[in-house]
Each structure stands twice: as C-alpha cells, then as structure tokens.
Amino acid sequence: MNLIKSTGTFSIFVIISRVLGYLRDVLIAIYLGSGPIADAFFVAFRLPNTFRRLFAEGSFNAAFVPSYSSELTRGKIKAKNFANDIFNFLILGLLILVIVVEILMPGFIFLIAPGFYEDQSKLELTTLLTRITFPFLLFISLASFFSAILNSHNKFGVAAAASIILNIILILIILLEKNSDDNLVIYLSYGVSIAGLIQLIFVYFFAKKYFSPDLKLRLKITKKIKLFFNKFLP
C-alpha cells in the first residue's frame, strides 16, 4: 500500500512539474523575448542540464539503486559504507568538473554554440551567465544521489516534489523582477543555481533519516565501487 501511495504521489508531482515547466517557458519567452539575451540564457541553462543528463538522471539511479539495495540486505552498516564511498567519489568528481568548466567556460560554449563567437558581446554575456548557472550541476547531482537513497527505500514522492522547486523559483523571479530590464536574465541565472541548492537541502532533509554522508579525503576503490562505475559510466 505504501508503494502504491508513493507511486501515486510521484505521478502527481511529475504532472505539476510539467505544467509549471510549461508556464516557466511561456513567461521566459514573454519577458526575455527571442533576442541575444534570451539566446545567452538558454545556453547558460542548457549547459549544466546537458551534464546533468549525463551524471544525475536515469543512469545514476540504474547503477546505484540495485547496488545499494543489495548492500541493504547485508546490513545497514555495509549499505552506509557503500553509499558513503560513492558520495565521496561523486562530490570530488563534481567539484573537479565544475572548477574545470568554470575556468574553460568559453571553450565549452564554443562546443554547444559556436555561432556565438561571431558576436563578442553575446559571447561575454553567455560566459557570465553560464558561470553563474553551472554550479547547479553540483547541487542537482548531489540531490539526485540523495533521491536515489530515498528511491531505494521506496520513497519516491520527495524527489518528484523537489523537481518543482526550480520552476517555482524561476516563475517567482520573473513575476517579481519582470520590470528589471536587462537585469532579469542575471536574476534568472542566479535563480537556477539557488534552486539547485534548495533542492539539495530539501531532498537531504528527508534522506538523512536513511543516510548522512561522512566526508573523507582518502578514497578507496573497491570491487563494488568499480562495478558501480562500470554500470554508471557509458
């Protein structure tokens, strides 16, 4: 019964998230228009989301949940140790990735929007906005980790509810700052990263009942860690 209830709650939040996502896109189109500012924001929004699809969505859950659930059958301590090892590898890898991309941002923009190099002001704006939004990847990937913990315990509603946060924050920013002219796109970019942080805090609040990480500087690659990354990485 609890599983059915959780699945129903998940479905409701997914529908709400999609409706809010549509409203968000409509408002962005209205207030940012279709000029260079809108183009810059869409690239800034797309780059961290492109990496998120690689690191923080289905492939991570598909690799982590079965392995973690298997460890749970062997005891809570073994499951915690496994999850903690994965968390430490994940946060280290994400920090390195975010720092490298922040430093080399113009190059990454060239990869996904090479035409921007023909307009220096557009390139500079896109670089600025993407450097603001890119930490979203760190926050949302860690949120996905804790969502996977919850999914392993048949708690699906929290992750689905968390997906609404980004849309709500961006909608509120547009409605409150719609008369801010060129500053609106800056506020929206900060809103993306702030929403990711809030989403991480929200999911962790519920996941800490089952797992709370212990940060370690020394990382050990075990057979189980290798097996996880073989499943996770393409």
Regions flagged by a language model, labelled:
Residues 1-234:
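Membrane-embedded alpha-helical bundles of multi-pass transporters/translocases
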